[in-house]
C-alpha cells in the first residue's frame, strides 16, 4: 500500500452496498469522501440536493445539470439522471471490491460512467468528463481528473488519450506529447483565450448559483489570469488546474458562509452560556461510558464547533457539537433499533439512557447496571444483553458511526465489564471531566480502564439529522445556518408559514428603518420554530440551587460543595420588573443556544440584575449579527446584481460602473436610502477595491451636510457603522483610501496593505498606514492631528507625503521627537507625526522618501535631517546622527541627544538636558541649571554656570561642575572630577564597584592642598576651601574605611602633589582648635579631640578616644574602647564592647549600653547609665553629686565601687524609690528607682574594707521593715547633711557588712 492510499475493509465495502441498496447515492459518496476519496467528494456534490451545497460544489452540480440539459435535454435529465447516478455508484462499489479495497483509477471511472449512461439510453455526450472538455476544447480533452483534483496515482494515461468508448484520437496523443515536452510561445494566445473563458464561466455560474451573496466578492478576480499565465509559461501543466481549483475555492470563500455567522456570534453568546447555571441550575455536559482501548488512559478531545464531532445526545433529532472520545479509545454502545448505526444518546450508556421504570439513568454505570441480569455486579456472557454490546471507535471523529467503527466485545478481546467504580471527578483539561472510573477485564486476564465521562456541550453548533426538501422558490430565500434548536432559516421558513411570511416581508423591506422594524419579529418567528417553544413552564425565581439528572448533568460534586442554600432574597419592584421584561428574550435566547432556562437562580439582587443585563446584551448582539448577515441577501441584493467583470490589461477586474448608476438612481427619489445603503455596503462589505464607492460616499456626505440631513442620516446608521466607515483597509492592488467624511472631526484609520496606495486622511485626527508598495499620503488644508505609520522594508519603493491646498514648506515646522518626525502647521491647525521616521538615521523601513508641496518643492530625507537639527529661541529637541554632529541648543530649555558618533552638544542658554550617545562626546551645559548625562564613551561633561547635574555613566569620563552648586556622578570607569576657582558647593557621588578603575579629583587654577581642609562627616569626605569659597562633598567616601565602591582613589593638585586614600584618612583624624569630628577606623585608633567641642567616633577596633578640653561627645564602636571626656561637660556612649568610660572633670553623661562596662564619672555632677551587661560604677574621692540609672532586664551582676572609702564612711538613705549613698555633703550617689524592683538595683556595693550584696538586702527586707524604716528615718537624719549617725541605724547597717573579697 502506498503512503496515504485509501484501501477499504470488507466491512466498509458492505456499508457501501447498504447505501446502494437504499438508493442513497449522496450518502454513499459522502461516506467515501469521509474516508479520503477525492472523486467521491465531487460526485457527492453532483448528486446532492441544492440545499446541502454552496459555493464551488453547487457550481459543479449546476454545471453537470447544464451539460445534460444542453446535450440530451432537461426532460431526459429529470427522468434518468438519478438512475444513471445510482448505477454508476453501484458499479464503483463493485470496482472497489474487485480491486481488493483499492479505489478505481480514472480509466475505470470513465468506463463505468459511460456504461451507466449508455445502458440507460442516454447519449455519451453527457459523460461527466465532457464538462471540462467543453470548456477546454483546445487543450486536455478528457483530462477531467486533474481539474477535479483526483490523486495522481489514480490517473491512468489511457483516459487522457482515449474517448470513453475506447476510440483513439491522434490529436489528443499529440497534445499529451506536447504537454509532456513543455510549451513554447506559439501556445500563448490560445491559452489566454481559454483562461478568459474559464474565469468568465466560473464567475457567471458563481454569481447565479452561489446563494451566500456578494458580501466578499471584491478583488477575487484580480491577478488570477496572470497567475495562470505564469504557470503555463513555466511549463507547469498540472499547476494550471490547481490554480483554477484554488481560485474557484477562493471565490467561494469570499462570500459569507451561512454557517459563519454562528462563529461570529459565538463570543456574544459566551456570557449568556456562562450564566446557564444561574438560569437552570445546570452545567450542560453529556454523559457516556467510555473504554480505554490502547492502555494510556481514557483520552478525550474538546468540542470544536462544526470542525469537530456532532452527535444527537438527547434524542431530539439534532446533532450538536460535543466533547468526544479520542479515536484510539471507544464508547460503549448498544444498537437498540437494529439499524446498524448509533443514532443518539439513548444508544450510549449515560444520563440519556432510559431505564425500565421509565426514569433516566443517573450516569453511565447506572445505565449499564440494568443489563446485569444475574445480579453479580459484572456484565459478561452470563448476562443476556452481553452479545448486543458494541464499542464504537470513532476513527474519523465526526460523531457519525460507520460499520467499520462498531466492534463486538469479542473482537476486542473483552471478557467482562465491572460495575464497581469510584468517583474521581478528574478534569481532563479540554472541557471534559472523568466523573467515575472502574475497569473491564480482557480475555487474557488483564484489566483496563472504563469510565463515565462528562463531555463538554456546545449547543450553538448544531445540525438537524433530517433535511427539509425545498421547492425552487423556497431555495431562493435568504438563509442563515441553523443554530441551537433552530433549523437553517430557509428550512425553518419552509415549515413555518409565519416565519416564511416574515422572512419574505423582511427581504422585501427597502430601507434600514423598515428592516429594523421587522427584525424583532423575524428573530421571534425563527425562535418559535424551536420544538420546545411554548412547552416549558413559566420561569420561576429561586436562590435554592438543585441538582437535576436529565438533559445534561447538573453541578459536579465539587461545584455543589461550593454552593450553599440561602434564604430567598427579596427583590425590589424595579428588579422584578426588569426580570419580567427579559422573560421573552430569555425564551428566544434559549431557542438560539439550545438551553432551557426554567428557573433563574440568584444570590443577591445585583446577581439577578446582572443576568438581565447579560440577557439584553446578548439579544442585542444576536439582532445585530442577524441583520448584518442578511443584509447582502436582502436589501442590498439588487445593487450587487449590477456588478460585472471587465478585462483590462490582460487582467480581470470587477466593473462597478453599474453599481454607481444604481445608487445614483435610488438617490434621485430617496436620498436617505441611497446614503444608508451605500454606507452599509462600504461598512460591512469587502468592496475595498471599489474606489468610486468611497468617492461617491464622500459626495453623499457633503450633500447631506449642505442639506442639513447629515446628523439624521448618521443616527439611522448608528455608531458602529459610522465607526467602521472611519476605518478602511486596502487590498493587494493599488488603492485610493480616503476619509469619506463621517463625523468631520472624528478619528479615521486607513490601511493601504499591499500595492501603491494613496491615503487621504482628510479632516480629523487620522491614522494612516500605507503597508508595502510605493504609497502616497495626502494632506490638505485642515488636515488635523494625523499619524503616519510607514513600515515597509522593501527596496525600490518610494513613499511620499504630499501637501496640497497651497501648503508650502515655509508654512510648516519640522522637528524630531525620539525617532518620530513631527510636521506642524505654524498656525497650529494641524500636525503630521511620521512614526519611527529616523529609525536607522532615516534610512530604515519607516522613512518617507520625499515630501512634496504644491509649489513643486521637494524635501528628501537628507534635507529633513538638516531641518530638525536647527535650534530656535524656544525649547528644542535636537538629535545627533550616527556619524557625529555638533548641536547648539541656543535659547530656551533644550534637550540634546547624542548618537554613536563623537558629538559636541552645547546647551547654551537655558536649563538644558543633554544626553550623550555611544561615542566620545563633549557636553557643555552653558548657562542655566543643566542636566548632563554621559553614556558609553569617554565623555567630557562641563556644567558651566548654574546648579548642574552631571552623570558620566559608562566610560572614563571627565566631569567639570563649573560655577554653581553642582552634583557630579561619574558612573563606571576611571573618572576625573575637575574643580577650579569658584567651584561652589558641589557633591560627588562616585559609586563604582569595579576593580581596576582609578577615579580622581583634580583641583586646577592654582589650588593646592594647603588651601583646603579635609574633614569627615559620617562616611562623607568634606574638602573645604579655607577662604570659604567652596566645598566638595564626596559622598560615602569612607564606606568600608575608604576601600569601598565610593572612594576617590587620588586627589591631584596643580603643584603636582597627590593625596592617596591613606593620606586622606590620616588628614581627617587630625584635630584642630575648633570643634572637630574625628572617626576611628576598623583596625583601632587613638583619637584626641584637643580644644573645642568635639565629636569622636570609635569603630570595630579597640579605640582610645580622648575628648580633651571642651564639651565633647564621644561614641564607642564595636570594640573594647576607652573613652575619656577630659575637661568640660562631656557625653560618653559605649556600644557593644566592654568599654571604660571616664567622664573626667565637668558634669558628664555616661552611657555604657551593651557589654560589661566600667563607668567613672570623675569630678562634677555626673549621670551614669550602665545599660545591659555586668557594669561597674567607680567613685573616688571628690566624685560629686552623681546619679546612677541602672535599669536592666538581664540577670547580670552590677557593682558600685567606692575607692578610698570604708563601709562606715558611706550612709544608705532611702529617698522615695531611690537609694542615696552619701559619703559627705559634697559626695553622694543617687541610684534612681532602686526600690522599684530588682531590675533597677545595683547588686553589690564594694568598699575598701567590705562589700554589701543584694541577697543581704533581700534577707533584711523580708525579715521586716527595720531597714526600710531605718532608711526612711535616715532620710530625715542630719547625717544626710553631715551630722552623726544614730546608733540604732548603725546597728541595723552593721550586719549587712561583709568582708570584701580580695
Curated annotation (Swiss-Prot):
Native organism: Neisseria meningitidis serogroup B (strain ATCC BAA-335 / MC58)
PROSITE patterns found in the cross-reference section: HEMOLYSIN_CALCIUM (PS00330)
Hemolysin-type calcium-binding repeats: 742-759, 760-777, 888-905, 906-923, 924-941, 942-959, 960-977, 1088-1105, 1106-1123, 1124-1141, 1142-1159, 1160-1177
Family that this chain belongs to: Belongs to the RTX prokaryotic toxin (TC 1.C.11) family.
Protein name: Iron-regulated protein FrpA
Record's subcellular location: Cell outer membrane; Secreted
Keywords tagged on the record: Calcium, Cell outer membrane, Membrane, Repeat, Secreted, Toxin, Virulence
SUPFAM superfamilies attached to this UniProt entry: beta-Roll (SSF51120)
Free-text note regarding domains: The Gly-rich region is probably involved in binding calcium, which is required for target cell-binding or cytolytic activity.
Membrane topology listed for this record: Peripheral membrane protein
Protein origin, superkingdom: Bacteria
Keyword Transferase applies: no
GO cellular component entries: cell outer membrane; extracellular region
PANTHER family the record matches: S-LAYER PROTEIN
Family matches, as Gene3D superfamilies: Serralysin-like metalloprotease, C-terminal (2.150.10.10)
Pfam families according to UniProt: HCBP_related, HemolysinCabind
GO molecular function: calcium ion binding; toxin activity
Function, in words: May participate in the pathogenesis of meningococcal disease.
Stretch list, region Disordered: 1144-1163
Tagged with keyword Repeat: yes
Amino acid at each position: 500500500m502506498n503512503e496515504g492510499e485509501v484501501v477499504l475493509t470488507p466491512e466498509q465495502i458492505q456499508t457501501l452496498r447498504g447505501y446502494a441498496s437504499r438508493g442513497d447515492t449522496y450518502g454513499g459518496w459522502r461516506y467515501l469522501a469521509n474516508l479520503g476519496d477525492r472523486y467521491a467528494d465531487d460526485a457527492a456534490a453532483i448528486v446532492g440536493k441544492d440545499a446541502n451545497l454552496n459555493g464551488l460544489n453547487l457550481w459543479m452540480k449546476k454545471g453537470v445539470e447544464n451539460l445534460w440539459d444542453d446535450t440530451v435535454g432537461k426532460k431526459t435529465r429529470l427522468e434518468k439522471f438519478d438512475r444513471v447516478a445510482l448505477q454508476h455508484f453501484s458499479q464503483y462499489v463493485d470496482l472497489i471490491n474487485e480491486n481488493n479495497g483499492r479505489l478505481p483509477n480514472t480509466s475505470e471511472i470513465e468506463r463505468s460512467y459511460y456504461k451507466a449512461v449508455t445502458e440507460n439510453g442516454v447519449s455519451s455526450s453527457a459523460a461527466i468528463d465532457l464538462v471540462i472538455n467543453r470548456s477546454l476544447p483546445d487543450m486536455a480533452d478528457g483530462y477531467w481528473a486533474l481539474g477535479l483534483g483526483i490523486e495522481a496515482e489514480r490517473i491512468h494515461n489511457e483516459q487522457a488519450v482515449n474517448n470513453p468508448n475506447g476510440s483513439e484520437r491522434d490529436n489528443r496523443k499529440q497534445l499529451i506529447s506536447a504537454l509532456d515536452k513543455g510549451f513554447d510561445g506559439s501556445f500563448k494566445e490560445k491559452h489566454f483565450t481559454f483562461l478568459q473563458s474559464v474565469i468568465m464561466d466560473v464567475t457567471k455560474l458563481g454569481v447565479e448559483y452561489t446563494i451566500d451573496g456578494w458580501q466578499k466578492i471584491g478583488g477575487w478576480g484580480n491577478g488570477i489570469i496572470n497567475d495562470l499565465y505564469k504557470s503555463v509559461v513555466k511549463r507547469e501543466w498540472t499547476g494550471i488546474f490547481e490554480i483554477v481549483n484554488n481560485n474557484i475555492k477562493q471565490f467561494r470563500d469570499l462570500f459569507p458562509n451561512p454557517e459563519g455567522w454562528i462563529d461570529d456570534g459565538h463570543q456574544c453568546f459566551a456570557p449568556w452560556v456562562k450564566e446557564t447555571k444561574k438560569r437552570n441550575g445546570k452545567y450542560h455536559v453529556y454523559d457516556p461510558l467510555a473504554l480505554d482501548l490502547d492502555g494510556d488512559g481514557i483520552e478525550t478531545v474538546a468540542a470544536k464547533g462544526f470542525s469537530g464531532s456532532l452527535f444527537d445526545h438527547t434524542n431530539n433529532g439534532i446533532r450538536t457539537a460535543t466533547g468526544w472520545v479520542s479515536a484510539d479509545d471507544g464508547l460503549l454502545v448498544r444498537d437498540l433499533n437494529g439499524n446498524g448505526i448509533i443514532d443518539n444518546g439513548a444508544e450510549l450508556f449515560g444520563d440519556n439512557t432510559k431505564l425500565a421504570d421509565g426514569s433516566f439513568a443517573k450516569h453511565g454505570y447506572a445505565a449499564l447496571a440494568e443489563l446485569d441480569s444475574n445480579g453479580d455486579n459484572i456484565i459478561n456472557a452470563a448476562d443476556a444483553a452481553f452479545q448486543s454490546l458494541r464499542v464504537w471507535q470513532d476513527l474519523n471523529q465526526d460523531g457519525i458511526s460507520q460499520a467499520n467503527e462498531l466492534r463486538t466485545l469479542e473482537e476486542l478481546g473483552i471478557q467482562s465489564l465491572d460495575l464497581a467504580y469510584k468517583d474521581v471527578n478528574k478534569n481532563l483539561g479540554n472541557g471534559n471531566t472523568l466523573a467515575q472510573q472502574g475497569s473491564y477485564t480482557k480475555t487474557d486476564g488483564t484489566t483496563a480502564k472504563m469510565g463515565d465521562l462528562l463531555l463538554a456541550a456546545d449547543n450553538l453548533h448544531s445540525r438537524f439529522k433530517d433535511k427539509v426538501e425545498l421547492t425552487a422558490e423556497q431555495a431562493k430565500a435568504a438563509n442563515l445556518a441553523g443554530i441551537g434548536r433552530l433549523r437553517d432559516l430557509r428550512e425553518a421558513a419552509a415549515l413555518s408559514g409565519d416565519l416564511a411570511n416574515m422572512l419574505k416581508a423582511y427581504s422585501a423591506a427597502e430601507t434600514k428603518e423598515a428592516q429594523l422594524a421587522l427584525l424583532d419579529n423575524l428573530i421571534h418567528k425563527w425562535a418559535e420554530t424551536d420544538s420546545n417553544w411554548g412547552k416549558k413552564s413559566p420561569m420561576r425565581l429561586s436562590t435554592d440551587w438543585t441538582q437535576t439528572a436529565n438533559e445534561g448533568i447538573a453541578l459536579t460534586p465539587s461545584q455543589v460543595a461550593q454552593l450553599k442554600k440561602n434564604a430567598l432574597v427579596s427583590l425590589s419592584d424595579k428588579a422584578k420588573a426588569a426580570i419580567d421584561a427579559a422573560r421573552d428574550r430569555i425564551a428566544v435566547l434559549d431557542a438560539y443556544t439550545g438551553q432551557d432556562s426554567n428557573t433563574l437562580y440568584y444570590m443577591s439582587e445585583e446577581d439577578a440584575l446582572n443576568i438581565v443585563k447579560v440577557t439584553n446584551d446578548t439579544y442585542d448582539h444576536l439582532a445585530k449579527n442577524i441583520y448584518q448577515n442578511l443584509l447582502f441577501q436582502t436589501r442590498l441584493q439588487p445593487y450587487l446584481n449590477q456588478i460585472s467583470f471587465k478585462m483590462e490589461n490582460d487582467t480581470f477586474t470587477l466593473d462597478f460602473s453599474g453599481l454607481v448608476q444604481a445608487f445614483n438612481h435610488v438617490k434621485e427619489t430617496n436620498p436617505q436610502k441611497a446614503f444608508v445603503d451605500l454606507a452599509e455596503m462600504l461598512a460591512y462589505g469587502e468592496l475595498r477595491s471599489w474606489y468610486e464607492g468611497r468617492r461617491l460616499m464622500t459626495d453623499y456626505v457633503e450633500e447631506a451636510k449642505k442639506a442639513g440631513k447629515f446628523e439624521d442620516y448618521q443616527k439611522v446608521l448608528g455608531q458602529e457603522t459610522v465607526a467602521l466607515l472611519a476605518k478602511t483597509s486596502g487590498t493587494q492592488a493599488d488603492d485610493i483610501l480616503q476619509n469619506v467624511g463621517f463625523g468631520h472631526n472624528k478619528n479615521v484609520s486607513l490601511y493601504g496593505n499591499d500595492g501603491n496606495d494613496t491615503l487621504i486622511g482628510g479632516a480629523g485626527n487620522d491614522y494612516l498606514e500605507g503597508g508595502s508598495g510605493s504609497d502616497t499620503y495626502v494632506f490638505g488644508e485642515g488636515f488635523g492631528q494625523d499619524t503616519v505609520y510607514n513600515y515597509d522594508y522593501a527596496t525600490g519603493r518610494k513613499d511620499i507625503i504630499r501637501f496640497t491646498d497651497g501648503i508650502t514648506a515655509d508654512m510648516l515646522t519640522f522637528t524630531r521627537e525620539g525617532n518620530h518626525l513631527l510636521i506642524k502647521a505654524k498656525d497650529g491647525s494641524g500636525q503630521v507625526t511620521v512614526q519611527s521616521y529616523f529609525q536607522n538615521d532615516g534610512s530604515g523601513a519607516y522613512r518617507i522618501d520625499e515630501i512634496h508641496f504644491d509649489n513643486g518643492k521637494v524635501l528628501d530625507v537628507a534635507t529633513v535631517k538638516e531641518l530638525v537639527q536647527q535650534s530656535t529661541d524656544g525649547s528644542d529637541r535636537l538629535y545627533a546622527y550616527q556619524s557625529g554632529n555638533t548641536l547648539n541648543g541656543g535659547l530656551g530649555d533644550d534637550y540634546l541627544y547624542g548618537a554613536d558618533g563623537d558629538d559636541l552638544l552645547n546647551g547654551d542658554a537655558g536649563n538644558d538636558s543633554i544626553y550623550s550617545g555611544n561615542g566620545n562626546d563633549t557636553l557643555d551645559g552653558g548657562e542655566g541649571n543643566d542636566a548632563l548625562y554621559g553614556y558609553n564613551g569617554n565623555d567630557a561633561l562641563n556644567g558651566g554656570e548654574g546648579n548642574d547635574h552631571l552623570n558620566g555613566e559608562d566610560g572614563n569620563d571627565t566631569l567639570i561642575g563649573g560655577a554653581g552648586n553642582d552634583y557630579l556622578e561619574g558612573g563606571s570607569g576611571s573618572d576625573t572630577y575637575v574643580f577650579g576657582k569658584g567651584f561652589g558647593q558641589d557633591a560627588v557621588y562616585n559609586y563604582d564597584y569595579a576593580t581596576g578603575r582609578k577615579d580622581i579629583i583634580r583641583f586646577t587654577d592654582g589650588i593646592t592642598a594647603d588651601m583646603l581642609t579635609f574633614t569627615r562627616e559620617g562616611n562623607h569626605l568634606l574638602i573645604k576651601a579655607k577662604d570659604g569659597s567652596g566645598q566638595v562633598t564626596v559622598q560615602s567616601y569612607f564606606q568600608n574605611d575608604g576601600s569601598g565602591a565610593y572612594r576617590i582613589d587620588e586627589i591631584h593638585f596643580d603643584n603636582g602633589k597627590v593625596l592617596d586614600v591613606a593620606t586622606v584618612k590620616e588628614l581627617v583624624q587630625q584635630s584642630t582648635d575648633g570643634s572637630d569630628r574625628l572617626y576611628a577606623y576598623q583596625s583601632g585608633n587613638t583619637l584626641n579631640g584637643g580644644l573645642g567641642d568635639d565629636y569622636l567616633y570609635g569603630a570595630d577596633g579597640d579605640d582610645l578616644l580622648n575628648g580633651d578640653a571642651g564639651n565633647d561627645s564621644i561614641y564607642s564602636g564595636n570594640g573594647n574602647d576607652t573613652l575619656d571626656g577630659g575637661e568640660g561637660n562631656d557625653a560618653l556612649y559605649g556600644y557593644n564592647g566592654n568599654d571604660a568610660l571616664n567622664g573626667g572633670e565637668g558634669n558628664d553623661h555616661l552611657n555604657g549600653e551593651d557589654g560589661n562596662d566600667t563607668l567613672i564619672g570623675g569630678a562634677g555632677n555626673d549621670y551614669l547609665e550602665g545599660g545591659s551587661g555586668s557594669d561597674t560604677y567607680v567613685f573616688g574621692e571628690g566624685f560629686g553629686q552623681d546619679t546612677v540609672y541602672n535599669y536592666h532586664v538581664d540577670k547580670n551582676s552590677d557593682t558600685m565601687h567606692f575607692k578610698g572609702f570604708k563601709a562606715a564612711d558611706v550612709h544608705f538613705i532611702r529617698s522615695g524609690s531611690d537609694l542615696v549613698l552619701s559619703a559627705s555633703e559634697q559626695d553622694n550617689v543617687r541610684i534612681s528607682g532602686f526600690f522599684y524592683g530588682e531590675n533597677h538595683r545595683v547588686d553589690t556595693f564594694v568598699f575598701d574594707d567590705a562589700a554589701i550584696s543584694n541577697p543581704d538586702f533581700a534577707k533584711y527586707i523580708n525579715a521586716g521593715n527595720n531597714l526600710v524604716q531605718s532608711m526612711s528615718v535616715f532620710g530625715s537624719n542630719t547625717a544626710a547633711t553631715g551630722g552623726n549617725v544614730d546608733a540604732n541605724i548603725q546597728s541595723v547597717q552593721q550586719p549587712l557588712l561583709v568582708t570584701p573579697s580580695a
